[in-house]
UniProtKB/Swiss-Prot annotation:
Gene: NA
Domain notes: Intact N-terminus is essential for virion morphogenesis. Possesses two apical sorting signals, one in the ectodomain, which is likely to be a glycan, and the other in the transmembrane domain. The transmembrane domain also plays a role in lipid raft association.
Positions bound to substrate: 118, 152, 278-279, 293, 370
Stretches that traverse the bilayer: 7-29
A GO biological-process term: viral budding from plasma membrane
Name the UniProt record assigns to this protein: Neuraminidase
Binding partners and assembly: Homotetramer.
Catalytic activity, as annotated: Hydrolysis of alpha-(2->3)-, alpha-(2->6)-, alpha-(2->8)- glycosidic linkages of terminal sialic acid residues in oligosaccharides, glycoproteins, glycolipids, colominic acid and synthetic substrates
Ranges for region Involved in apical transport and lipid raft association: 11-33
Function (record text): Catalyzes the removal of terminal sialic acid residues from viral and cellular glycoconjugates. Cleaves off the terminal sialic acids on the glycosylated HA during virus budding to facilitate virus release. Additionally helps virus spread through the circulation by further removing sialic acids from the cell surface. These cleavages prevent self-aggregation and ensure the efficient spread of the progeny virus from cell to cell. Otherwise, infection would be limited to one round of replication.
Protein source organism: Influenza A virus (strain A/Tern/South Africa/1961 H5N3)
GO molecular function: exo-alpha-sialidase activity; metal ion binding
S-S bonds: 92-416, 124-129, 184-231, 233-238, 280-292, 282-290, 318-336, 420-447
Amino acid sequence: MNPNQKIITIGVVNTTLSTIALLIGVGNLIFNTVIHEKIGDHQTVVYPTITAPVVPNCSDTIITYNNTVINNITTTIITEAERHFKPSLPLCPFRGFFPFHKDNAIRLGENKDVIVTREPYVSCDNDNCWSFALAQGALLGTKHSNGTIKDRTPYRSLIRFPIGTAPVLGNYKEICVAWSSSSCFDGKEWMHVCMTGNDNDASAQIIYAGKMTDSIKSWRRDILRTQESECQCIDGTCVVAVTDGPAANSADHRVYWIREGKVIKYENVPKTKIQHLEECSCYVDTDVYCVCRDNWKGSNRPWMRINNETILETGYVCSKFHSDTPRPADPSTVSCDSPSNVNGGPGVKGFGFKTGDDVWLGRTVSTNGRSGFEIIKVTEGWINSPNHAKSVTQTLVSNNDWSGYSGSFIVENNGCFQPCFYIELIRGRTNKNDDVSWTSNSIVTFCGLDNEPGSGNWPDGSNIGFMPK
């Protein structure tokens, strides 16, 4: 480096250091100004007082400083908005049903990342709606998924995941060990009823606010089971329908009232009308209504009306257009107080909504298999009337496509409960031509609005040939 370059380099370094020093000085000045202003806002300074000397012949002056600093500390407490128990509300008016969510779980499972499930349902809290399902402890197309056609194994558990999403590793929460379940939100906390154990000695564990709070033991020792859809809560008391006993003979049916996770009472469902009842789909329309499955004698569906104290009414949906599967061709018998005794068993989980004397019924399009899905409105179908007529038919899944269970759920919306339902779209070993070792499902959901709906077809849509075996 020649002398000129050295001089230039030294000059540049000197200028840089000077600039840094200047910036530090300016920053220090600003900092001190701000600090003094804050101290001025928050302290009271008593200026020095001069005290005369105590010792004679001494020229010293004693200066006493009395500094008092007052710090004003403001504490802000953020409290969560107080939650209230869900009230009793009527159903919102509706004229048809509109697509809400579709999870496409089987199509998305082509790469084996999707959890094998069945018996799905939907339930909502104050903020979100959630999908629930009974998982099989296996991923689609893996070796552990072979044989997942079985209903009850110790590997099944109730899981929850965001509605409209497929159940994959990373987006689900395991709730409890269960091969039968029901869930509901009381306005403050979630409650889950989870059945598991040996067929002849099962128990139901009640989970409330994430803690196990109570249990129900099998009393008939014959597959204790519950709704496979949401229970319902009014003013903090939740109502759950439970069955124990044969699937195709006389069984025991109970309604349990549970508050904050504790059983407060139960009643036996009277057998004067209902011969068999399981897998109820319940909703609130001031009282709790449950539309259920008769797996023994009825292709018409049994129902109950319940409040927070007792079972108020029971019967069978009167409509001559039946909604279980299998069922006779339309029209069939009108039977309001007993099962139809026509194509009575086995059956499939389903739902209905009462609107005055009319009734909306979901059902498979096929009369003898789980394919297709439609919802019909039967004028005066809730009562014994000669005027039963299908005034509305919405075909939502064509008869060329597989369906399965269906059930109701409700969403609080502007002072009433919006009626909604889901359709389980089963794929796998239960279906002819589905040449795979597993059984699983996707779902599609619909909600009612007081508008005229359009039309469409919303099947599972997966090409089974693309799927892992």
